[in-house]
Amino acid sequence: MLLHIPAIFTAEEVSRIRAALEQAEWADGKATAGYQSAKAKHNLQLPQDHPLAREIGEAMLQRLWNHPLFMSAALPLKVFPPLFNCYTGGGSFDFHIDNAVRDIHGGRERVRTDLSSTLFFSDPEDYDGGELVIQDTYGLQQVKLPAGDLVLYPGTSLHKVNPVTRGARYASFFWTQSLVREDSQRTLLFEMDQSIQRLTRDVPDHPSLIRLTGTYHNLLRRWSEL
């Protein structure tokens, strides 16, 4: 499942965040890449322990934890702290698949990368190129969203970032370990939950809603891992 979640941050908030990112000291993005990915990665990245990365990352997660669409789709158990990158001057990241497991907190905890997310902090007209290209069951999907919007997609996806030939593309990316590791099961639960929400709005007293809601929770109980 590939899902576009709009307006995590307002235009005013994005403007302040981008201004702060533009003033930050960036490092070579290869520092956080795996052995194979490092050969394909050509971008800049904020150090993981940078105060600005922690500040914006905490604000992002607070928003997402209160966002019904993200919670319904991701069913998050744990999240790898958001990272921040900048593509400019031809920067790119060739096709790769993200590492299956990431260490956090100095290796004391691990996150399985069931889902990948990218939150854009540059508007499409601010740069040329820079499309996030994701290969899914329907072929190659090119993603270039308005600033403040997020795309959520399976961590198993082959993906790349096209070269940025003008301007700069600022974004955050992170991984989520879901309660439900299998993408097809998460997709089924998401579609059920969205249908239940629409039925609750349109026909709130329909007797089948109780049974349908119960079926959703029984499936979640069967498939979830804690």
Swiss-Prot record:
User: Would I find NAD among this entry's keywords?
Assistant: no
PROSITE patterns per the UniProt record, alphabetical: FE2OG_OXY
- InterPro entries from the xrefs? Oxoglu/Fe-dep_dioxygenase_dom (IPR005123), PKHD_C (IPR041097), PKHD_hydroxylase (IPR023550), Pro_4_hyd_alph (IPR006620), Pro_4_hyd_alph_FE2OG_OXY (IPR044862)
Residues annotated as binding Fe cation are H96, D98, H159
Gene Ontology biological process terms, A to Z = DNA damage response; intracellular iron ion homeostasis
Which superkingdom heads the taxonomic lineage of this protein's source? Bacteria
Q: Which positions are annotated as binding 2-oxoglutarate?
A: R169
Q: Which organism is it from?
A: Pseudomonas aeruginosa (strain LESB58)
Q: Which cysteine pairs make disulfide bonds?
A: none
Q: What class of enzyme is it?
A: oxidoreductase
Q: What is its EC number?
A: 1.14.11.-
Q: Can you name this protein?
A: PKHD-type hydroxylase PLES_48951
Cofactor(s) the protein needs: Fe(2+); L-ascorbate
Where does the Fe2OG dioxygenase domain start and stop, copy by copy? 78-178
Cofactor: binding details: Binds 1 Fe(2+) ion per subunit.
Q: What are the entry keywords?
A: Dioxygenase, Iron, Metal-binding, Oxidoreductase, Vitamin C
A molecular function (GO) term? iron ion binding
